[in-house]
């Protein structure tokens, strides 16, 4: 099943999940009762902006401004939202 991500959607971290910088890993991670996920590349930059207030469009716009030279960034951001939703890391507000 494909997940449709709209620019007007707003997301938050799923219940019982916590996002943080893990000094030992030198990376952003998502902690949840079953374990931990280490976020690679720009994934941490996307999740860092998921605050139950910003729309997907606002997150995309902010990341495009922050990383203007990143090719195909919008598609990668939407892909990150799709993956995070399919894994149960995010919930729609």
What is the predicted role of each segment?
Residues 1-48, 93:
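Acidic, low-complexity/disordered tracts enriched in E/D and polar residues
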Residues 35-93:
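Long, charge-rich, low-complexity alpha-helical segments
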